[in-house]
Amino acid sequence: MLQPSRRKYRKEQKGRNTGLATRGTHVSFGEFGLKATGRGRLTARQIEAARRAINRHIKRGGRIWIRIFPDKPISQKPAEVRMGNGKGNPEYWVAEIQPGKVLYEMEGVSEELAREAFRLAAAKLPISTTFVARHIGA
């Protein structure tokens, strides 16, 4: 599972996920990409599940890049604990996703295979996505 090796602070405030992605909006490494059209949080488990779905479909065909990283800790209090007594402990890690962000990239496979692999991966994710291809010269 993806998570930072170390952080300056263990806990982080909730914040608001607004606006559009300004960085990581183009296919930079591979030929095809899976781009977010919705906004939300992707947990490390969801990122890994989608990666496995892609790998299973393309077998040993191509190369994959994961363009997102879960660097935000989400804390939770245990079940049936009274309010107060401080903030809960970090339970899992998420990546905040804005519309326009490229999540995964792939090369070395045909477009049909890439489309199907990304379709399977998108089913594992809680946000809406679309298939994009690299524009040569852009």
UniProtKB/Swiss-Prot annotation:
Residues 1-22 are annotated as: Disordered. Keywords: Ribonucleoprotein, Ribosomal protein, RNA-binding, rRNA-binding, tRNA-binding. InterPro entries: Ribosomal_uL16, Ribosomal_uL16_bact-type, Ribosomal_uL16_CS, Ribosomal_uL16_dom, Ribosomal_uL16_sf. Transmembrane segments: none annotated. Pfam families: Ribosomal_L16 (PF00252). One of its GO terms (molecular function) is rRNA binding. Residues 1-13 have a biased composition (Basic residues). One of its GO terms (cellular component) is cytosolic large ribosomal subunit. One of its GO terms (biological process) is translation. CDD domains: Ribosomal_L16_L10e. It comes from the Bacteria. The keyword Ribosomal protein applies. NCBIfam families: rplP_bact (TIGR01164). Part of the 50S ribosomal subunit. Belongs to the universal ribosomal protein uL16 family. Binds 23S rRNA and is also seen to make contacts with the A and possibly P site tRNAs. This is Large ribosomal subunit protein uL16. The gene is rplP.
